[in-house]
Amino acid sequence: LAPAAMLAPVPEAVPTRRAVLAANMETALNISWDAAALPGERMLVVGAGVVGLLAAHLLARIPGVSLTVIDRDGGKRKVAEALGLAFATPEESPGEADLVVHASGTPEGLRFALAHAAVEARIVEASWFGDREVALPLGEAFHSRRLRLVSSQVGEVGGAMRGRRSRAERLALALSLLDDPRLDCLLDGPSAFDDLPATMARLAASPGVLCHVVLHHPDA
C-alpha cells in the first residue's frame, strides 16, 4: 500500500480509464511550461506519440497559434485530427516555426526539429535518449539563427512555474485537464491483466496503438 500523502484523487468527471493518461498529461503540462509559448506563434510538435499529442493538445489552446503535429507515420493523422490538431508527415511540413517541441525519441526527429526552427526559435527537447549519443548539426544554421535548445524533464517543475507550483499541484492540474472526452482517442482496450501475454503479442504486431488499458480487475 502507498502512503496516503503519495496519492492523488481523480476528479469525478474523469473516468478511471482515461486517468491512466495522468503521467503523460503531467509530462505534457511540464513541456508547455518549459516552452513558454506565446500567442500567435507558429509551432511544430515532432512526434505523434501520447506525450507529443498531449503537448500539442495543450499548446493549441493558446490564442492565435498555428500548430502542426509532425510524424512519419501517416496513420497518426486520424488521431491528431480527432483532437482537432493539424497533422503532416515530414514531407508535408508547413515550414519554419517559432517553437518546435521534439517528442519523437529519435535523432532524426531532433535533426528535423533543428532544421525547421526559425530565427531565434526555441526547440524544446522532450524525448529521452538514455545513454545514447546523438549527432546534431550544430555547426550549420544553429548559430546563425541563434536557436535555443531547451531540455524538458518532468522530474522538476518546469520553467517559470518552478518555485510557484509543487509536484502535487502539477499532478492535480494534469488530472483536471483530462476532463475532455476527446482524449479517449488515445486509448485502446481494455484487456484483462490475466490476458496480458496474448495482449502483448497482439500489441507487438500493432505499432500504431498509443496507450492500451489493462484492467487488474475485469469488473472495473
Regions of interest found by a model, annotated:
Residues 1, 44, 68, 122-124, ...:
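Structural detector of well-ordered beta-strand residues that form the stable sheet scaffold
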Residues 1-8:
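Glycine-rich phosphate/adenylate-binding loop and adjacent beta-alpha elements
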Residues 12-90:
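Mid-domain Rossmann-like dinucleotide-binding core that forms the NAD(H)/NADP(H) cofactor-binding site
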Residues 20, 44, 48, 69-70, ...:
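Glycine- and other small-residue-rich loops at beta-strand/loop junctions that grip anionic moieties
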Residues 38, 60, 105, 118-119, ...:
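Short conserved AdoMet
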Residues 78, 83-150:
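Glycine-rich cofactor phosphate-binding loops and adjacent beta1-alpha1 units
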Residues 136-187:
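C-terminal substrate-binding/catalytic core of Rossmann-like NAD(P)-dependent dehydrogenases/reductases
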Residues 165-220:
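C-terminal hydrophobic helical "lid"/dimerization subdomain
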